[in-house]
Each structure stands twice: as C-alpha cells, then as structure tokens.
Amino acid sequence: MKVLIACEESQEVCKAFRLFGHEAYSCDVQEPSGGHPEWHILGDAVPALRGGQIVTMDDKGHYIDAWDLLIAHPPCTYLSNAGARHLWKGHQLQEDRVMKGILGRDLFMRFWWADIPRICVENPVPSKVLCLPEYTQIIQPYQFEIGRAHV
C-alpha cells in the first residue's frame, strides 16, 4: 500500500509500515527525528494529500498515483475537549484561541474529507464547540499494549 502519515515528526508509524513492505511516507512541518529523511516530506501535509509528484527531504521525487491509506495526527492542542476550558479567561472569550481552534478544525476536516479510500485521523475526544464529526471509535493504548516494541 501507499501510505501517507500526516503530522508525523517521529516517523515511528512510517517505519512500522515500511517494516511490513509498504511504501510509507511521513509528512510534517518539522524535520524528522526518526532518522529517515528519504521517507519524509517536509512541509504542509495538505498538498501531499492529492498524491502526484512528492519530494522527500533527500531531494528525490516520487510519483504517487493515489494514496491507499492516510493516517493523520493533527495537533490537538486547540481541538480536544480537555482544552475547551481555556476558551474563556475570566468572563472574556479568548478570540485567538478560538481562531486557532477553527484553523485546527479546518486541517482536521481536510484529512477527514481527503479523497483516499482508507482514512484514520487520530485525536482525543473533540471539543463540541468546534463541531467536529463524531468519533467512530475510542482506543486507549493500554487496550493493545503487550510490551513496547520499537521499530
């Protein structure tokens, strides 16, 4: 499969898919800490969603007809229900925080609506204020962890 892992600086998910033979690429606005710049698209993930010609950090071009799977980890600071309590300070709405939440929601929705057959958008329980779609499942790490495996 051709796999795009958006908002992934660590490359842990990318390396796991590569280990099983998939053509996986991480994409983030930060340089990767995972040691594989040849698998990393540095920059905004939104243009990469379309596929086509992508360039990895080793300056090599790769042509992706279409992605088979998108796994996205958009920043959750302004999207999660836990952060909603910071929208008001005293009795004053924190407009900058609201705007950051709206921008975060827009990024989330670009992933959610991407023209890719299999999509996973990982995020905590969303804030109701931002009208994000209802989550389809809740997975806690302890439900699947049988010891930590690092790839």
What do the predicted segments below correspond to?
Residues 1-148:
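Conserved active-site and SAM-binding loop architecture
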